[in-house]
Amino acid sequence: MRAATDAREPVPPATAALLRTFLTGLQDRVPLRALWVHGSLAGGDYQEGRSDLDLVAVLARPATAREEAELTGLHHRLAATGGPAARAVHCAYPDVTALDDPTRCHLGWAHGELLHRPLTPVTRRELHVFGLVQYGDGPAAVLPRVTDAQLTAFVLADLRGFWRPALEHPAYWLRDVWVDLGLLTLARATVTLRDGSLITKGEALSVLAGMGAPAPLLADLRHRRYGPPATAPGPTAAGVSATDRAHWPARRAELTRAFLGPAIDRTLAAYGDG
């Protein structure tokens, strides 16, 4: 594996073996042009067994229906045999001839199923800034760069059109994934809007503290991402009494929504959203 730009932390052996197995499986099933890594593994904040494994497999042409079925089987087999990292694989399958438009949807695999979604400006910027090349051409050879204006517009639209309305659905925020992504996305978006840079999830925790996020939320998030693997994340790690354990998800949801609403509004107002 080589970096598209600077060298990063070594890939954990089990994840490296998984990537080799996945690459071989792709080469046997689809017309593979390149395989790239982005997200936490490429950015240097990867927590094996906890982080998603974010990949882009560039195809020489669109996958056929038969190839889509083959990809589904490959992902299911990896998830059954490859451990936690394999179950966390998210992979986009764009056609190399259709990479110009950041809004265009491409075949992908996430959350245990095939779907279609865009290769977003944030993903594209990650690939150019710190993407890892597992196979084939690097991003610079085939992936158009996004402008700062495109990146800013996407980040603002994501906050305004997705995350702010999501706060109107209290049940969403009872789940770890919504709490984590909502908080981390706000912090990372704020930094990107401020200076154009991309930060890791670990760095986002410090940003959230500076934005006034409640300490119990940050302790809970930090524990689930970085705490001892044998210790179940929960309210004890977040400074909440054990007697309140059953009530913590609801309390955490309230804290998260109460913080995120005004914080998102301030960020949108500060960076030019009308």
Language-model region placement:
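Catalytic metal-binding acidic patch
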Residues: G39-R77, A88-Y93
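Short secondary-structure boundary/capping segments within folded domains
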Residues: L26-D28, G43-E48, G83
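Nucleotidyltransferase catalytic cores
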Residues: G131, D137-G274
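Short, solvent-exposed polar/charged micro-motifs at secondary-structure junctions
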Residues: G44-Q47, L99-R104, P229
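Helical scaffold of the NTase/Pol beta-like nucleotidyltransferase catalytic core
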Residues: M1-W36, R66-E68, G274
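Residues that form or immediately flank small-molecule/cofactor binding pockets and catalytic motifs
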Residues: S40, V96-A98, Y226
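Long, highly charged amphipathic alpha-helices
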Residues: A17-G25, E70-R77, A258, P262
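Conserved NTP/Mg2+-binding pocket subregion across the NTase superfamily
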Residues: R2-A7, T72-R175, L183, A189
